[in-house]
A protein has these predicted regions:
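Alpha/beta-hydrolase-fold catalytic nucleophile elbow
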Residues: 15, 40-41, 89, 127
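Acidic catalytic loop of the alpha/beta-hydrolase fold
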Residues: 92-97, 131-132
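Mobile cap/lid helix-loop segments that gate and shape the active-site cleft of serine hydrolases
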Residues: 35-78, 83, 96-106, 114-118
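Short beta-strand/loop motif that positions the catalytic acidic residue
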Residues: 81, 88-90
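Gly/Ser-rich "nucleophile elbow"/oxyanion-hole loop immediately N-terminal to the catalytic nucleophile
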Residues: 1-18, 34
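Conserved hydrolase catalytic core segment
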Residues: 29-35
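Glycine-rich nucleophile elbow surrounding the catalytic serine of serine-hydrolase chemistry
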Residues: 16-26
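C-terminal catalytic histidine-bearing segment of alpha/beta-hydrolase fold enzymes
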Residues: 61, 107-149
Length: 149
């Protein structure tokens, strides 16, 4: 991508929905060429996902990294993205990514971004909507990319 004539390698961002959002966790943390990250309906703590989601969506537990809770949880992975701009959006009724874990992740990331002196580079939005990149979420993502790229 960065070698294309129509791409500015200093202006590459990433967005992901659901499991694609989980891919943003790792890509954003590990790939320095990504300048901005957006996650849609793809964030909660592993703890909440395992305890609250498993009875409904046990087929999705393949996203769980065995043994990870001995070392940390979702917020610890996402903290590695800082201080890059990160926007996380979720919905209140998301059974795939429980709100209890989403709130914990966001609270901890607010502290991380503040410690970096960059609280404006982290934002989270939660709405009463569906598990999708809705027009509202898509518009918010577009504004975030335009602001930071």
């Amino acid at each position: 991508l960065e070698n294309r004539d129509d791409v500015d390698p200093e202006r590459i961002g990433i967005i992901g929905l659901c499991m694609g959002g989980q891919q943003v966790w790792y890509a954003g943390a590990l790939e320095s060429r990504l300048k901005v990250c957006v996650i849609v309906c793809g964030t909660s703590t592993y703890e909440a996902m395992v305890l609250e989601m498993a009875p409904y969506h046990s087929h999705c537990l393949f996203t769980y990294v065995p043994g990870i809770l001995r070392y940390g949880d979702t917020q610890d992975i996402l903290a590695l993205i800082a201080p890059k701009p990160l926007l996380i959006m979720n919905n209140y009724n998301d059974t795939w990514f429980p709100v209890s874990g989403y709130k914990k992740v966001c609270e901890e990331l607010e502290a991380v971004y503040s410690a970096f002196g960059a609280p404006e580079r982290f934002e989270h939005i939660i709405r009463d909507t569906v598990h999708d990149i809705t027009p509202e979420f898509g518009g918010e993502a577009r504004k975030w990319f335009e602001k930071w790229l």
